[in-house]
Amino acid sequence: MYESDEDRVDAAEQLAEHNPHAAAEAFSAIACDQAVGDEVRLSAAELLADVDPRAAAPACLAIARDGTVGDEVRRSAAERLAGLATL
């Protein structure tokens, strides 16, 4: 259905305009999908935070805890998670 992981993110962004709840589910699925590239997962988590900050916390945590994710991306996810904790 999608040619790339970025296409999935693009589709979720378009969905956010019409159905934020469905977009949040899509962003969460992308962010938690270990088959998706690290940067795309982080991007999905960041976009999820814009749509539903509470739902972004588990997504950021999943990225931060994933030992297969690069250190910089894991650190960014942890920083985003810390920022969400202040909401």
Region annotations inferred by a language model:
Residues A26-S28, A59-L61:
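Buried hydrophobic core positions in alpha-solenoid tandem helical repeats
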